Regions:
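Non-catalytic terminal accessory segments
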Residues: 1-135
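Membrane-embedded segments
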Residues: 134-140, 145-228
Length: 228
């Protein structure tokens, strides 16, 4: 129900971003003003924008899995596109109504091409950074003092793991990397604090292998987890 209500907003937003992209590409090179090129790029854009819907409607298959992965990456990149374009348009709106020097150059065809290229570089940089951080386990160490008796224990080395998001994008290779880092910390106890699955359970490519990999976590007092 929520998806149906948000669908018109999503489509309008995608159309707005498409119009901005076409204007920028046209200012970069006249080849992007040709109808044939625009139609081809529009088909690709529609495929990306509707990949999440198409994947939902298709039966489970390798192609459906591919579309799910595409839609996951698309939604992540789309967020950066929206933020970058909105900030750029707000700055454009403000500068257009001020006595900004060289305003004519900024709002010329060449200026539009430069601004659009800067936006593209920002979007690509944040997208690559996001993909990298999602696929590489980050270890943060903290010392916490609890003002109560620990019985026979003076200290406890706890490893807290969160947001595994197993699914179409994160699988067994990532879990191998994570388990290796956990075991290197030599924990007394391991806690998995939710969001184990990103999509549905069926999104995991080989759940038996993932389970085998996770069973390799070594700790003195065991591993405790909550689904999310």
């Amino acid at each position: 129900m929520i998806a149906i209500c948000l669908a018109p907003c999503y489509l309008l937003l995608c159309w707005y971003l498409w119009r901005r992209a076409i204007r920028w590409m046209g200012s970069c090179h006249h080849v992007f003003e040709h109808k044939g090129v625009q139609i081809g790029m529009f088909i690709l854009y529609v495929f990306l924008a509707l990949s999440i819907v198409i994947a939902f409607l298709l039966p489970h298959s390798d192609f459906q899995r591919f579309l799910k992965m595409v839609s996951n990456y698309w939604l992540g990149v789309l967020l950066y596109i929206i933020l970058t374009v909105v900030v750029a348009d707000l700055l454009r709106f403000i500068l257009k109504r001020t006595r900004f020097p060289h305003k004519e150059k900024l709002f010329s065809r060449g200026g539009h091409a430069v601004v659009g290229t800067i936006c593209l570089c920002v979007i690509c940089a944040f997208s690559v950074l996001g993909i990298y951080t999602a696929r590489h386990t980050v270890v943060t160490q903290q010392d916490i003092t609890i003002e109560k008796s620990g019985g026979t224990l003076d200290s406890l080395h706890v490893v807290l793991v969160a947001d595994l998001h197993l699914g179409y994008s994160i699988g067994n290779d990532h879990m191998k990397q994570m388990v290796k880092k956990i075991n290197a910390l030599d924990p007394d106890v391991v806690l998995v604090a939710g969001d184990i699955f990103d999509n549905e359970y069926e999104a995991i490519k080989d759940p038996d292998k993932v389970a085998e990999t996770l069973s390799g976590i070594k700790s003195k007092y065991g591993v405790y987890a909550t689904y999310g």
